[in-house]
């Protein structure tokens, strides 16, 4: 290159491949309050040092690529690169490490969960130098979280809208999830709401199929809501699933729900996508609709302990993208969920400030500042005998959702709903009187059966039903 055409970028440039750790492993780095921090569970390929593996994660999820490029000289790499600043071995696991990476805030578009995930997990998980990679947790700084609207309304506003306080809310997923006509579906909703539930729900894959088009379902469910409200004097709702094949169609369904005057709609946020979810959440805030979120597809991403992304990360992302409810497992039901881990991400959904607590899987202190909280929904294989444990585990700010545990009642849907409501009221009263739900739960339910034949019948049907399998995802030994 002649002196006339030589540029600053070309001075000192040396083509070739160099170790990631020379640039991206910086154990001396002190994290900034504005950094997004990530904790990755890294399993390197044999022969790859943990420092190189951690640095590769930092590089490939920020500014790096596989070879040196001359355009590095056109920017400030130190300002924009991700940094692997700490590595610790995972106790009890061979060749597995927790690698901590700090990302400068300027790497991310404001108010975009889509962009955040595209950067942090979009490409690096296919990297050949790693046998497996899992994103365990993220620290979202207030500087970034304040660029998001968050939940459309939040816990307190929802309680005020419903005029319901001092207890968990009760819900039911209509079963069978597929195959009912719209009129029969609406009838099931009415019976459950009349029997004592606060909400009924579309299942995640109820969209607009040949046997039940969405508009018909919305109309019959709205009729069920208004009829049940008139009879009970309580505000009722049904999660009308607005998830659709396009964002435009999704919004059309949400607009129709608002025109019907119903209080809440629903979205499958992982299959529907974060861009669609954020748009729907903004519409819901502007138009007074609550937003229920289903996490369909989450276990594809989060169930394996050594690869993927933990649900606590998906939960934080949902709080940022927007939702008033989100499914969070049950601990005691048919779906995966270890108690301490579940309580960790439940706090991350509901609370304003959550301290680091590795015993519950929380890797970073998280400050949400003024962002509203999300109500966790316990759903999946639960019935009246689980009510004391659910009330004790999840507390008042939760939705306890019994699908088969309502519709499977031998006397029908309304008695099934009544059984659940009586069981809940008995547990809340016992707790308020100072009784130990964990120790005395069965006695509390049995005593309530004396005053409720519906509850007694439910207890008899499900007395031997248990789901006793060890969870796959457990807390690391610290």
UniProtKB/Swiss-Prot annotation:
One of its GO terms (biological process) is reductive pentose-phosphate cycle. It comes from the Eukaryota. Its cofactor is Mg(2+). The disulfide bond which can form in the large chain dimeric partners within the hexadecamer appears to be associated with oxidative stress and protein turnover. Coiled coil: none annotated. The modification N6,N6,N6-trimethyllysine is found at residue 14. Substrate binds at residues 123, 173, 177, 295, 327, 379. It is an enzyme of class 4 (lyase). The modification N6-carboxylysine is found at residue 201. Residues 1-2 form a propeptide. The modification N-acetylproline is found at residue 3. Keywords: Acetylation, Calvin cycle, Carbon dioxide fixation, Chloroplast, Disulfide bond, Lyase, Magnesium, Metal-binding, Methylation, Monooxygenase, Oxidoreductase, Photorespiration, Photosynthesis, Plastid. Its EC number is 4.1.1.39. It is found in: Plastid, Chloroplast. Mg(2+) binds at residues 201, 203-204. Heterohexadecamer of 8 large chains and 8 small chains; disulfide-linked. The disulfide link is formed within the large subunit homodimers. Belongs to the RuBisCO large chain family. Type I subfamily. The basic functional RuBisCO is composed of a large chain homodimer in a 'head-to-tail' conformation. In form I RuBisCO this homodimer is arranged in a barrel-like tetramer with the small subunits forming a tetrameric 'cap' on each end of the 'barrel'. This is Ribulose bisphosphate carboxylase large chain. The lineage of its organism: Eukaryota, Viridiplantae, Streptophyta, Embryophyta, Tracheophyta. The gene is rbcL.
